[in-house]
Amino acid sequence: VFQRTANFSVPAVNRPLTKQQEEAYKREYRLHREEALRTPFGIGGHPPPQKYAHEDTEEARSESFEKKWHTGGNISFLYAYKDLLTNQQANETACAFVRDKIRQTVKNPEVAQWLMPDDHPIGTKRLCLDTGYYETFNRDNVTLVNIRKDPISEMTATGIRTARNTYELDAVIFATGYDAMTGAMLDIDIRIAGGESLQDKWAAGPRTYLGLVTAGFPNLLIITGPGSPSVKANMIAAIEQHVDWIRDLMAYVQAGGYQQVDADTEAEEKWVAHVNQVADSTLYPLANSWYLGANIPGKPRVFMPYVAGLDKYRAICDDVAANAYRGLTLAKSAS
């Protein structure tokens, strides 16, 4: 395993469902979907936490984290306390718990140390789920290569060469990431009649209204774009909400005889400021994550998702629609 940057991982605790559990879930499926849409992450089944971390003793916190560890799931773990993603001291109690788990699990102390993240609060990068990940490093046929200490110099015909060693490999699985949230759109040469491109508009970072439209680019409607919950929610729920909202907008446009939909510049400015304000009230900006574009050299460092929660975002979008699509400019002739 060639590791550049350690990330936190918690157990998935996947398990087979009994026939009774499966039947009950299918019977109540619609209720589960409706519940999910009322939650911040778009994922139901996780009661929101009622306590702040400092309200528990160290022993009680350890018991709480232990219970979440054995329950499994990243949402469940981050729901141990109300302030894990907003208070650095609270977050550090969760970090310390997971680091202790790594020490207890991985027999080689040096390898264990390499696997312990020390550069970001837990949950501010996508929290990984695993089945026996840390236990894997106790196997005789598994080696961890710390490429910060021994960087990769080249790929060879038979494997990978680092500054110090050569590794013969049958297969290489890349986990190097991608240009999230804006990369696919900016790969398309989207231009308006005056010649300005979307690349020009977003040169200092993406700017949208609700993550759905960007001022000056009429009739360009974006699905789960920057400025919306997008990757910080259940993507199915996020996509469906956007598609439904755009469908209703199109019906409104057609009924009114409009030809063009655009974002009001002032509404966009206020939304961008709101997205940044919400992000700054959390610990997310403290991580060099792909949420900020940190994995792409030269990409502007802008926190792209809206992290107030899918539930709050849906309410905002519904309110915009109920008020004649406030913040949008509708025209009966294309400019």
Feature map (PLM): residue ranges:
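N-terminal FAD-binding dinucleotide-binding subdomain shared by FAD-dependent oxidases/monooxygenases
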Residues: 1-335
